[in-house]
């Protein structure tokens, strides 16, 4: 019995109770949302301890951090440190996207330090295990999914929405960058070389059988996410939206939790349309977005471009933000890049929660308490309430004022001046 099937029977497990407490909502309300597929609560049956993180309607906006090796840079312990730092900075989930080294050993090592939901993209390993990507057979697509499920992976990105219809849309498109999704590119390359349908799409029911056995949440990958502003909102992307909506229905029918992934690079004026379209065609499935990045020229600062897009997407209904680091488009991120990426995404997530139904009051209470601390010039309380207490404290201490205010205004602190004026009046 999967968690979504339990929810449909009204069963409130201890795990659900903990998740509801974390979200500040009633457990009965949470299981209703899970039962409809509006919220997912990822947890593989083989993982004993996972901090509950509900994703979707009425729940707080969550942040995912990607870690993992590349073929050019394999330092497992650095990736472990990234996973630790990401969680310390507030990441609600961690994904291992390793593509270099002993992928089984790396995945298991990173999982040892991850306490929140843990995700992977299995096709990366399937591709690495073969001499050439196109040499995979159809069974390879599924064997690797089962391997990850047995290892305890809580959620997996699988590009099941790619099929011949969408490939033909891509072929006729005027895209500048084509496909920028690694999983999508692997799948499309395999299809074109072997002249066969995507196994994940063709045998989706079989895929769901594997996932259901371990209660793995499927994250339906967006192979056609736009990789630049020029490519945003084209027919290939919307074709995939529709396919993903149909797959969401199948997931719910089979009792498998699912969420849907989205773009990408999107200009500000298209974000709301894109998000609302995805929410509509997927019947309010939890929406997991990479950014979206609102410009292509922010190299070195793409975490900021992504946070801007994420905040706007959250206003329209996005539920889960995949962080972007300053190294995006440039290099494998460092530990510090990971921390900065999580912080930027957490700022966007909190900004979303300030207006999100079910979370607004709780989120605004924190801002209210910060304002009180500023009114009282209570610096320790301000540090405590900050997204990044360590950095706030370090900056304040860098140039201290002789007054109780900060060194920006010193004895001309506006709050202090007006307060003292009223006290003298």
Swiss-Prot record:
Signal peptide: none annotated. The keyword GTP-binding does not apply. Substrate binds at residues 66, 95, 124, 159, 181-183, 222-225, 261, 288. The gene is thiC. GO terms for molecular function: 4 iron, 4 sulfur cluster binding; carbon-carbon lyase activity; zinc ion binding. Keywords: 4Fe-4S, Iron, Iron-sulfur, Lyase, Metal-binding, S-adenosyl-L-methionine, Thiamine biosynthesis, Zinc. This is Phosphomethylpyrimidine synthase. One of its GO terms (biological process) is thiamine diphosphate biosynthetic process. Pathway: Cofactor biosynthesis; thiamine diphosphate biosynthesis. Belongs to the ThiC family. Zn(2+) binds at residues 265, 329. It holds the Pfam family ThiC_Rad_SAM. It comes from the Archaea. Its EC number is 4.1.99.17. It comes from Archaeoglobus fulgidus (strain ATCC 49558 / DSM 4304 / JCM 9628 / NBRC 100126 / VC-16). PANTHER family: PHOSPHOMETHYLPYRIMIDINE SYNTHASE, CHLOROPLASTIC, THIAMINE BIOSYNTHESIS PROTEIN THIC. [4Fe-4S] cluster binds at residues 406, 409, 413. The keyword S-adenosyl-L-methionine applies. Gene3D superfamilies: 6.10.250.620, Radical SAM ThiC family, central domain (3.20.20.540). Its cofactor is [4Fe-4S] cluster.
């Amino acid at each position: 019995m999967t968690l979504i099937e339990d929810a449909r029977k009204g069963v409130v497990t201890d795990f659900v109770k903990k998740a509801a407490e974390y979200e500040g909502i009633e457990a009965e309300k949470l299981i209703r949302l899970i039962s409809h597929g509006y919220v997912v609560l990822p947890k593989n049956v083989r993982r004993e301890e996972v901090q509950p993180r509900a994703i979707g309607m009425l729940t707080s906006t969550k942040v995912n951090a990607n870690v993992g090796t590349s073929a050019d840079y394999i330092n497992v312990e650095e990736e472990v440190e990234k996973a630790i730092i990401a969680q310390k900075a507030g990441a609600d989930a961690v994904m291992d996207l390793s593509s270099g080294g002993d992928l089984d050993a790396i995945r298991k090592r990173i999982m040892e330090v991850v306490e929140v939901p843990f995700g992977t993209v299995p096709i990366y390993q399937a591709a690495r295990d073969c001499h050439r990507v196109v040499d995979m057979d159809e069974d390879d697509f599924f064997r690797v999914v089962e391997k990850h499920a047995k290892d305890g992976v809580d959620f997996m990105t699988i590009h099941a929405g790619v099929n011949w219809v969408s490939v033909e849309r891509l072929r006729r498109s005027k895209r500048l960058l084509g496909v920028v999704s690694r999983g999508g590119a692997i799948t499309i390359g395999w299809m074109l070389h072997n002249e066969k349908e995507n196994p994940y799409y063709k045998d989706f029911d079989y895929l769901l059988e594997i996932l259901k056995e371990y209660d793995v949440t499927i994250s339906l990958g967006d192979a056609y996410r736009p990789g630049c502003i020029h490519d945003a909102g084209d027919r290939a992307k919307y074709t995939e939206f529709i396919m993903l909506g149909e797959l969401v229905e199948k997931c719910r029918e089979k009792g498998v939790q699912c969420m849907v992934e989205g773009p990408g690079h999107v200009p500000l004026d298209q974000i709301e349309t894109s998000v609302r379209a995805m929410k509509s065609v997927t019947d309010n499935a939890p929406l997991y977005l990479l950014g979206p990045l609102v410009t292509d020229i922010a190299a070195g600062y793409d975490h900021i471009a992504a946070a801007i897009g994420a905040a706007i997407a959250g206003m329209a209904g996005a539920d889960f933000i995949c962080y972007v680091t300053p190294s995006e488009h440039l290099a494998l991120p460092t530990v510090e890049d990971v921390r900065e990426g999580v912080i930027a995404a957490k700022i966007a997530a909190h900004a979303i929660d300030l207006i999100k139904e079910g979370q607004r009051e709780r989120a605004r209470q924190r801002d209210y308490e910060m304002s009180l601390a500023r009114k009282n010039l209570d610096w320790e309380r301000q540090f405590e309430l900050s997204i990044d207490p360590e950095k706030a404290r370090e900056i304040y201490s860098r140039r201290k004022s002789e007054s109780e205010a900060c060194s920006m205004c010193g004895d001309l602190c506006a709050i202090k001046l007006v307060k003292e004026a009223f006290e003298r009046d």
